[in-house]
Amino acid sequence: MAVFALSPIVHLTVRVFEGGTGAAFSLLFRQRTLDLAVRTLVLTLVVALGCLIVGVLAAWLVTRTDLPGRRFFAVALAAPLAIPSYVAAYVWIAEFPVLAGLPGAALVLIASCFPLVMLPVAAAFASADPGVSEVSRTLGRNAFRTAWTVEARGVVPAAAAGTLLASLYTISDFGAVALMRYDAFTLGVYSAYRGGLDRTVAAVLGLVLVVIATVLTLLERRLRRGATARTGSGVSRVAEPIPLRRWVVPAWSVVLAVLTVSVLVPMLGLVRWMIHSLRFTIAWRDVLTAMLTTIQYATAAAVVVVVLAVPVAVYVARTSSPVGRAAETAVYIAHGLPGITVGLAVVFFGIRFLPAFYQTAVLLIVAYAVLFLPLAVGPARAAIVSTSAAVDDVSRTLGSGPARTDRRVTLPLALPGIAAGAALVFLTVAKELPATLMLRPRGADTLATELWSATQVLKYGEAAPYALALVLVSVVPTIVLDRAVRRRSVPVREAPVEVAS
């Protein structure tokens, strides 16, 4: 799989050196490239911090507390993944033009990406054994201090993986930064590809994105180094939810504020477009066809990516070999590239080595696998790391080999993380645009491509049915994800946990 992940980098390298080494270095060190790098890094840092704070807090509230309506909020807080960032950006910039620039781009991307942190962290909270927290409380620490000093350490791998995904999404996003008029690397790449026949500028900028993605991946690996779960009994159970008591109203305020920014405002904009579209004849047959095509592609991609991701996740979670680290790094680097770069690489290799599959769903699924494999690897690896090592040891002492132990013990315990990855892949594929536009079979339009086509010609009323259908498509996987997480969250009866006054 690392070979597929590295194919866009190979393509970029070939393009860069086609123009000569001197020309490539002159483009690399010009002021324009430096400005784009600084602006991209600033945006990425702001979005990463915002997603980390909002995602971890939201996951803790819906999995570890008695927040009223937490089951509904667990599903609702994943809904932003179904709303394309470029749709949310348009709604916000139309209503609040003053947000143009860094504030608007950061707001939209945090609102769109924090579920990438929340979902794996929620799965990690749900899978964690409460034994360590119980010991902390017997030593006199209250619930909040235990959550901050003990439970937070257990979700470091999941939080780091989710933050990495949010960061990579940020450096590869085009629609939101373009609509918010924030000049970042992706805008430079797209402008270079569109501006002429010489693709060297775009390739050089793409390679800089590779460097940034590599740095982010190595930083994430360092943050989660040594963060493994160690429990004694290996009994699968979850502690009684923490009573919020007088903190219920502040907790509700936080959750509702997040939902307002990430879901309510974009949805109100879509509803207004939908009302406007009623003046025209809506081609419901086209909407239904695009919906079915989207479901088919997203389902196929989710299955393929999970099948590829689970062995990678098991390997990198259980070993620290250079081969495993290199494979994981390659997988994450590809996720930081713009979809058009990956699409062009797949076209490049497809025409030369797999011409029979050009403009078929096969190459499209390959592109999805290259782009979105980290969405499944990260949560699955974090869930595997958080499972009890003692359980694996007991299984092996009873005669089970490593493969059988992984199949019968580790993977079932890691199911919430694997389900989180599958849901993330499904939701992200459903709204993927550049790669789908380039590689889809002729006439096979998805909800995202139809939505983009309508918004490109400012027909926002006609775009509304496709946007709302895209949100509808996301409901089922988010519900499945919520149930998978809650299967690991059924509380056992323990002594009530008191919150410090």
Regions found by a protein language model. Give the residues of each.
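Glycine-rich helix-loop "coupling/hinge" segments at transmembrane-helix boundaries
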Residues: 171-197, 431-460, 493-498
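Peri-membrane helix termini and adjoining interfacial loops of integral membrane proteins
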Residues: 13-25, 180-186, 227-235, 271-275, ...
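Membrane-water interface segments at the C-terminal ends of transmembrane alpha-helices
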Residues: 1-19, 29-126, 154-174, 202-221, ...
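Polytopic alpha-helical membrane proteins, predominantly small-molecule transporters/carriers
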Residues: 37, 140-141, 149-151
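The alpha-helix within a helix-turn-helix
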Residues: 136-137, 395
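Membrane-helix/interface signature in polytopic inner-membrane proteins
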Residues: 122-133, 143, 381-392
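Alpha-helical transmembrane segments of integral membrane proteins
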Residues: 218-255, 488, 492-498
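Short alpha-helical segment immediately N-terminal to, or the first helix within
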Residues: 26-27, 124-125, 149, 165, ...
